[in-house]
Design a protein with these regions (language model features):
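Short coil/turn linking the two alpha-helices of tandem helical-hairpin repeats
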Residues: 385-389, 422-430
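Soluble small-group transferase modules, centered on the S-adenosyl donor enzyme superfamily
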Residues: 4-100, 105-107, 146-147, 163-165, ...
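The AdoMet/dcAdoMet-binding core of the Class I SAM-like
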Residues: 53, 85-230, 234-237, 242, ...
């Protein structure tokens, strides 16, 4: 009440008529005396605000949508993962860890909802550190334990609140794998995480066979910004490569992976790396449990990326071009997330010999077919009309996905949606379901799911 007293005294002593003073001072009095929340949080229709923290650097909230999925948001603008992106987030952790032959120490830069970091728990010989700039993000992790487990209970996993660049510059030991989360360059300070100097410091941290993966949110970037990041990355990791986290056209994610040695995948990588059933089941949940799923995510090597990005400046501390480029994306008219993804898959060429250890004609042919199917699947995803009605959906996706499977019967992302659709149709349209299952048996005879479903 002392503040109110001083304000009233100010009004009495002020020499101008009272009404001149009333508007600004009265407004201030209202703000002080009336308890009003100044939180600005956009809540989805049918959703709710689950938790909120105001911090020195940012406001952080957990919101749920009408389906009950929880999302972590920073400053109500940047969504940092959640329960609905479990599939994608987990793959972002598994792919780099699987590409290293035997990781013992891993570093995760950025925590978000903790789902990517939680993938480290599936590797029994791995110790992992996770660094998060915003302390309030770590405070809200318990709201995502359904997807992550209780991370603090695992003595192999360590969570720390710190600045990523400072931690990297002062880390006392090397890491086999470093995974950098999805940082939007327009977020305060995030552009500095894409500088040449930062990439060099990370390279200095890597062990002899170490690798660094920088995930990029294609759905929050434009071509100019992406090219700048790629050029900067290749300036430090000339043998870098590009990988897709998944095949979604709504929120595509590209991974740039750099290493001190060439990355090669053995044909029996799955048997070599996955010793425990729990680990296999974890990979199965995110469709990384088949031999071609890991090399199938590969897009191209450093030379292909260099051609794609073209000539131009790199992002550095002295010339922070991303600092000025990235904010333009936030405020310009939104484009379809798939547009940049299509530019990437059309503009970056992959060759089986770039990534496969074995010099087998059959293995090379299968992987090439898988890549063709993958690209066709992505293109079909941008062209197909969506529907919640199973009959309409059958009409829209049956032929495109069967065509994909004819290209590569190994391509599971086209097979399982049709299996699921056949299962739904079996209750209301058994003849249509049976016809679809017969067609699946014909294009993918080595798979058994269609046959099993027909017998029930």
């Amino acid at each position: 009440m002392q503040i109110v007293g001083f304000l009233m005294l100010f009004i009495l002593l002020y020499r101008q008529p009272f009404w001149y003073t009333f508007t600004p001072v009265g407004s201030l009095l209202i703000l002080i005396l009336i308890p009003t929340s100044l939180r600005i949080v956009t809540i989805p229709t049918g959703g709710e605000l689950v938790a909120y923290r105001d911090g020195i650097m940012a406001s952080v909230s957990v919101v749920s949508d009408r389906l009950g999925h929880r999302h972590l948001k920073v400053n109500d603008r940047f969504q940092m993962g959640g329960t609905s992106s479990l599939y994608s987030d987990r793959r972002e952790g598994h792919i780099p860890l699987l590409l290293h032959p035997d990781p013992k120490q891993a570093l995760f830069l950025g925590v978000g909802a903790g789902v990517t970091f939680a993938a480290a728990a599936e590797y029994p010989d791995l110790k992992a550190d996770a660094i998060e700039l915003i302390p309030e993000v770590l405070e809200l992790l318990p709201y995502f334990t359904e997807s992550t487990g209780i991370l603090s209970d695992n003595d192999r996993l360590s969570l720390k609140s710190s600045d990523a660049r400072r931690f990297v510059a002062s880390a006392g030991h090397s890491y086999d794998v470093v995974i950098a989360d999805l940082f939007h360059p327009a977020r305060d300070g995030a552009a500095s995480l894409y500088t040449r100097e930062h990439f060099v410091k990370i390279k200095d941290l890597l062990s002899t066979e170490g690798l660094f993966c920088q995930w990029l949110p294609l759905y929050q970037l434009d071509r100019q910004t992406l090219n700048s990041i790629i050029r900067t990355f290749l300036d430090v990791y000339p043998k870098g490569s590009a990988w897709l986290a998944h095949y979604s056209v709504d929120a595509p994610i590209l991974g740039l992976i750099g290493s001190k040695k060439d990355i090669r995948i053995e044909s029996d990588w799955l048997n070599r790396r996955v010793k425990q059933k729990s680990h296999y089941n974890a990979l199965r949940e995110v469709r990384l449990h088949e031999p071609l799923t890991l090399p199938g995510s590969y897009l191209g090597n450093g030379l292909a990326l260099k051609r794609f990005a073209g000539p131009g400046p790199v992002n550095s501390d002295d010339h922070p071009i991303l600092l000025y480029q990235a904010p333009g994306y936030v405020y310009r008219a939104e484009s379809k997330p798939s547009e940049l993804l299509l530019e990437v898959i059309h503009g970056v060429e992959a060759k089986p010999e770039d990534i496969l250890q074995a010099n087998s004609t059959r293995a090379h042919s299968r992987l090439s077919a898988y890549w063709l199917a993958r690209d066709s699947f992505i293109i079909a995803g941008t062209e197909s009309q969506r529907s919640m009605d199973p009959y309409t959906l059958l009409h829209n996706i049956e032929e495109p996905l069967l065509t994909v499977l004819k290209t590569s019967p190994d391509f599971s992302p086209a097979y399982f949606p049709l299996i699921k659709l056949a299962s739904v149709l079996s209750k209301t349209a058994p003849d249509a379901s049976k016809t679809l299952l017969h067609r699946l048996e014909q294009v993918a005879p080595a798979r058994h799911e269609a046959t099993v479903l027909m017998q029930h």
